Amino acid sequence: QVTTILEGVIKRGTGKKLRDLQLNLAGKTGTTNENTDAWFIGFTSNLVIGVYVGMDNPKPLGKFETGSKAALPIFREFIEKSVKKSDARPFKVPEKMTLMVVDPSTGEKAKFNSKNTIIEAYKSKNVLNGKVLYSDNNRIDTNNILKFY
C-alpha cells in the first residue's frame, strides 16, 4: 500500500518530473521549514536512492529550493545513468493484497469508460465483488480511499 502511494508521488505529485523516464519508480520529496534542507528518496524494485541538499550550518537554500527543485534533479541524473529500462522490474504486489483501478474522487472501482483513474492496492479482505469495504464494520466506503492505509 505504501508503495502505491509513493508511486503516486511520481505519477501525479511533486515527483512528476520523473514520469518521462518510463521506469517503475516510487518516491517522496521533502523540504524543511524555511527551505534549509531539501531531499528526495526514491526507489525501484531493487534500488533505493536518497538525495539530501543542505548545509552543515543550516541556512536557507533559497526561497524556491524545494525537494522537487533541488534534490529531484540530482536523483534523476543518477537514475538515468545507473538504471536501464530493462532492469526496472515492476514492484511486486504483496500476498493478501489486491490491485484495483479506482476513481480517485469517489474511491470506487472505476467504470470501464472512466478517464480519471488510478491503481490502488487494498488488503484483499477489504475487497468484495469489486467494492472496497471498511475492515472494522464491513460497510462500503465511497468517500475516502485513504481510510484503508
Residue ranges and their predicted role:
Residues 7, 24-149:
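Soluble, non-transmembrane domains of envelope/secretory-pathway proteins that act on or interact
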Residues 10:
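Flexible, gly/ser-rich surface segments that form the specificity/activation loops bordering the active-site cleft
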Residues 16-25:
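Surface-exposed, Gly/Pro/Thr- and Asp/Glu-enriched linker/hinge segments
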Residues 2:
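Serine endopeptidase catalytic core focused on the charge-relay Asp
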